[in-house]
Amino acid sequence: MCSCDGGPGAAGFAWHWGRHVTPSGRDTETPTDIRDYAVVGNCHGIALISKEARVEWCALESFDASPVCFRMLDDEIGGYLDTRPMQPFEVARRYLPKTNVLETTFTTASGTARVIDFMPLGRHPDAAPDDFVRLQALPWLVRIIRATEGEMDIRLDMLPGVGWGTCEPEVRRIDHGVALNGASLLCSHAIEIHGARVSGVVHLRAGEQLRLVVMAGHCAIPADVLSRLDQLLDITVAYWKAWIGRCGYKGPHVDAVERSALALKLLTYAPTGAIIAAGTTSLPEVLGGSRNWDYRLSWVRDSTLSLFALSVLGYREEPEAFRKFLFNCGTGAVFPTQIVYGIHGEHDLTERELTHLRGYGGSRPVRVGNAAHRQRQFDVYGEVMDWLTLHRELGGSLRPPELELLRRTADYVAEHWCEPGQGFWEERDEPQHFVYGKMMCWVALDRAQVLLQCRDYDAVMRTMVEDVHRRGIAPRGYLRKCYDSDLVDAVALRTPTLDFPLPPGCLQATIDEVMDKLVTPRGVYRYKGSDGLDGDEGTFVACGFWLLDALLFTGKKLQAQEWFDTMLRQANDVGLYAEEIDAESGRFLGNFPQALSHLALIHGAVLLDFVEHGGPEVLQGTHADRVQHAVRMMEEANRARQAPQAEVDAGDWLLDLAALGLG
């Protein structure tokens, strides 16, 4: 619980924002620590909310839509929604159990109020009762504030962000609220317009509520929408509980696993099946620096790793939806045709710099789009083939045209594997011969032979292994980051999942080098050395979880458990992670919430439980082999449980807009 003063205009105290000067010389408020954000969403849109319940990012219609709130990227013109007590307050928050519905509790000297934030979603009326992919969602952010004890004055402030701040907001009155160019704000109480801003003060006594809805500007507004919010909340809660109730994992750290699974599901875009890397753009990897990227896109590699994590928990619909998305993105000479796509399957992701925005804490530029879509990364072919192997072995299908495309892709890899690329980390430097990329080319051909039921690539695979052994291993026996370099790369910690043949002792030597060069008490750096960009980034959360995999594989079970516990302690108060963590301060860095961080947590927790019950021999084989074994073990364990699992009736999470009078 943290203590704060009340909002602007509160009596009996002074409100002082911390201030610093950006590199441009402009004053700006000290930004909300990324660690202090929670997230709500509905598999279409997403919102980031601070500990004090201020909405600082909100994209309503889709993840990549122009946000109506983006204060975290510019505290002057970015837009926000703020409702907080007028008196000094203490605040605590949590997610409602097994949901992505956020509850924030304000406590003042005079009373207590509970804030509920959610974005409505549920089962589509035409979907089957067990279909958790075909969804109905409303492009709304709903906030319900209920005084539970005593009384409280709540101050409401909203500034809409329009067109990334390039347009002056226009505000006009409508029934029950105001229309903003780009959105509407409905409110159960009177609010005032002050130029582009909306404000009001509401006095609540115990049992009374303040109800707010921020909705996309194109939405028709039903007359009684504010009276329907409790029904929408019930449906949304039921959906999330029903979805997470299908999770097969019941082992240690189940709460952390379920929270990570809920985060991954929230980052799926239901209309197409795409999975985004994170919910935001341009949250910096270096505070005040230029390592600021747009992650509201679907990286093929990150998505397939997310689906490994969801598959091991027993989910099958999301992988099938992504398979359709991926093959629909284009069937060129090779598959996939690029490493990242837009959430609607867009190929052109031209990177633009929004130079008029201050950036998070003065971190410029703010970027929209991502130039990585033009990069050549050889590891992606192995990641896709590896996942498709698992997908088919768990009952998924591959049509003949898709198999033919995979054959062409394997032929391409067999011909071009010896060429340089940008690597797993998308370095914006000259292409290099990344060792992990070479190993993943071997994985691509190995898994292709399984999928195609052939042995056509044995000879080139032997050549790949010889080349990695000759040029990819340093004199001290560890895997290099690149040929002709003695640097080490933390992505090598994923080697145990590849089944790539290495000389005896190579993996242990690699772990030792990573421990010596990249590990800190808070986490693991990706790499050291020049990558074509300025500044030193933080430790990478996913790498921290990968370390325990390598430790387990080399028989260090106790050390792996201790390291996993260390990584769990790095989560924020609601169990979420950004991309990176500052090694000294513990401050979150990078976009939020980060899919790669959460899928790595799931992988680590399941792996620890897997080894505990199956012994170290279960770690042999490929990533797909491990997942299949883990799924079988979970199914057997759950069948042995005598207590039936509580279920949510499918009718509880049916979102029928017509029946609710919202269609």
Task: Give the predicted meaning of each segment.
Residues 2-663:
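Acidic, mature catalytic/reactive cores of soluble proteins
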